[in-house]
Amino acid sequence: MALRFPRFSQGLAQDPTTRRIWFGIATAHDFESHDDITEERLYQNIFASHFGQLAIIFLWTSGNLFHVAWQGNFESWVQDPLHVRPIAHAIWDPHFGQPAVEAFTRGGSLGPVNIAYSGVYQWWYTIGLRTNEDLYTGALFLLFLSAISLLAGWFHLQPKWKPSVSWFKNAESRLNHHLSGLFGVSSLAWTGHLVHVAIPGSRGEYVRWNNFLEVLPHPQGLGPLFTGQWNLYAQNPDSSSHLFGTSQGAGTAVLTLLGGFHPQTQSLWLTDIAHHHLAIAFIFLVAGHMYRTNFGIGHSIKDLLDAHIPPGGRLGRGHKGLYDTINNSLHFQLGLALASLGVITSLVAQHMYSLPAYAFIAQDFTTQAALYTHHQYIAGFIMTGAFAHGAIFFIRDYNPEQNEDNVLARMLDHKEAIISHLSWASLFLGFHTLGLYVHNDVMLAFGTPEKQILIEPIFAQWIQSAHGKTSYGFDVLLSSTSGPAFNAGRNIWLPGWLNAINENSNSLFLTIGPGDFLVHHAIALGLHTTTLILVKGALDARGSKLMPDKKDFGYSFPCDGPGRGGTCDISAWDAFYLAVFWMLNTIGWVTFYWHWKHITLWQGNVSQFNESSTYLMGWLRDYLWLNSSQLINGYNPFGMNSLSVWAWMFLFGHLVWATGFMFLIFWRGYWQELIETLAWAHERTPLANLIRWRDKPVALSIVQARLVGLAHFSVGYIFTYAAFLIASTSGKFG
């Protein structure tokens, strides 16, 4: 018999129905379930695929550089970053005739182009790139790295160069190398780039391979380093009148602690950033020597974990047994990695706008909005993935004997208390927040806005004041001019920080009021409910009172027939599926809040947000409806404009989103009947019946249909909001 897809599963390959194709795609990356898999091959396959992943990333970033160099306007943007619109790439085939060509010919280009809202122009400019040649050089270098990655992946699939399982399970060596090598050395190298190339570039010096050995980054060279006079590197920083990219107002300092923002670029001081990376490098280089390997110095992680037993004896055996549990479970390791990466991605979203690191990016409002939204959605998907793999760990890898009475076992033992507390928190937040919004809605509807319940977020305002925000009048810690912390830091970093935090032209510690109080609690509701669903899915993954043998059914099962009295929708996969809807919903509220508050700040009418955000109709009318008007007007009797493409994407996003419900509401029987009718018609239609297929068409399984529905819902949801966000922001601010 000819080899059929999927090669990794003979059982599936012999399936006579279309289930073969869909189940084959669904399990292609579940290496553990493949025929003939061994632990060694599993680790080697994953290791080799990482190189392929790197190759794709390098190819993609190379493409960004290449297209901007070829079709962009980087060199003219560099001359005037605040007024020239950065071009991402040309549009090859602008449909809809001459009006489209005219609408999309912008940014000083000769033909139709797409504008870049990714921030790459600001990033490349900040790190010292200035010409198209620089961009081409970078693109070629990344292409080279991509090729090297592919070769490395192939190389490590050859029998002689396949690492052994013991190599993959050497946790101490891996941690040391990742901490010192990946984080430490790369941070040190980045500090070097900033000091040798980017900082001179910001002062009008063009440093490249041909002259970087001759241009001293600091007038005194390495002298202060070797004589211990490190403070010399911080003396004579750039002045507040410094023009970025020129020597006007420039200083000579390379490692500073100024605090606050560069007045012209509204971004963090480049010398502060270099100092930060040097400190990070030092910490990680030290951290990479913490764990004991062949050299007999440092800690054994197993010893550390086994010693972590709570004193008093009432909290069980602590971390005993965790080392082998984690080290032998790829799902546990992936869960930890995804949880960490999810948190850091969300923190990136929060910090990119509040503490912008790239020159002039703070004044590019559409880019700010796009980057915040982009990173929050990615964080959401990564975090839900962490719980998915945590649940798979409990089903496939958890060994009760090995983890007796340790923290994992105790989580399972106390799951009812954990889940019910989360449930209580979600119910409390939901009913109270909705109650306040609905009450305020009714008061406005009846023309008595003064009867709204408006709660000042005094605790959050107090925290902002403690960090130096003076407008609330709390006079506490850094907002108190007589405090010891204020006086101690006055000559170091505080002037820049206090100026920044009390200046209303940036997004640092925004002034908050009753509208913020309400939406924060709405977001808290979303976060707690998403967490509740995910935690319940993972803690009940092995079994529950309703279905004690659940782990025997695997991660995703539809149900165990009608005889068990309701075993549908309780697999760990179903919890993940439900949680993704809540995650999207929550991030919707987060991005709505961020965007509306910033639009009113940028337009100088912040009172609109303050007055309209305290009741639901305000959100619907003054945020969603008011800002979608440009989209709905993308096509009109007078032809088209540069927002037309977003108007189309807005419509298309709604279409994709709505298609999701078709899969989520109609299940197998409906589709099976429809398929059989269509197959009957096909076989009796002349010409059409010349085309035959080998696999008998059958409907998707319940779980697969849910996945397809969820995918359409998610993609449509994000497409729709992306179009709304970019069009409403760029329509106002260009």
UniProtKB/Swiss-Prot annotation:
The chain crosses the membrane at residues 46-69, 135-158, 175-199, 273-291, 330-353, 369-395, 417-439, 517-535, 575-596, 643-665, 707-727. Chlorophyll a B1 binds at H654. GO terms for cellular component: chloroplast thylakoid membrane; photosystem I. The PsaA/B heterodimer binds the P700 chlorophyll special pair and subsequent electron acceptors. PSI consists of a core antenna complex that captures photons, and an electron transfer chain that converts photonic excitation into a charge separation. The eukaryotic PSI reaction center is composed of at least 11 subunits. Its EC number is 1.97.1.12. PsaA and PsaB bind P700, the primary electron donor of photosystem I (PSI), as well as the electron acceptors A0, A1 and FX. PSI is a plastocyanin-ferredoxin oxidoreductase, converting photonic excitation into a charge separation, which transfers an electron from the donor P700 chlorophyll pair to the spectroscopically characterized acceptors A0, A1, FX, FA and FB in turn. Oxidized P700 is reduced on the lumenal side of the thylakoid membrane by plastocyanin. P700 is a chlorophyll a/chlorophyll a' dimer, A0 is one or more chlorophyll a, A1 is one or both phylloquinones and FX is a shared 4Fe-4S iron-sulfur center. Keywords: 4Fe-4S, Chlorophyll, Chloroplast, Chromophore, Electron transport, Iron, Iron-sulfur, Magnesium, Membrane, Metal-binding, Oxidoreductase, Photosynthesis, Photosystem I, Plastid, Thylakoid, Transmembrane, Transmembrane helix, Transport. It is found in: Plastid, Chloroplast thylakoid membrane. This is Photosystem I P700 chlorophyll a apoprotein A2. It is a multi-pass membrane protein. It catalyses: reduced [plastocyanin] + hnu + oxidized [2Fe-2S]-[ferredoxin] = oxidized [plastocyanin] + reduced [2Fe-2S]-[ferredoxin]. Belongs to the PsaA/PsaB family. Its main location: plastid. PROSITE patterns: PHOTOSYSTEM_I_PSAAB. It is an enzyme of class 1 (oxidoreductase). Chlorophyll a B3 binds at M662, Y670. The gene is psaB. Phylloquinone binds at W671. GO terms for molecular function: 4 iron, 4 sulfur cluster binding; chlorophyll binding; electron transfer activity; magnesium ion binding; oxidoreductase activity. InterPro entries: PSI_PsaA/B (IPR001280), PSI_PsaA/B_CS (IPR020586), PSI_PsaA/B_sf (IPR036408), PSI_PsaB (IPR006244). [4Fe-4S] cluster binds at C559, C568. GO terms for biological process: photosynthesis.
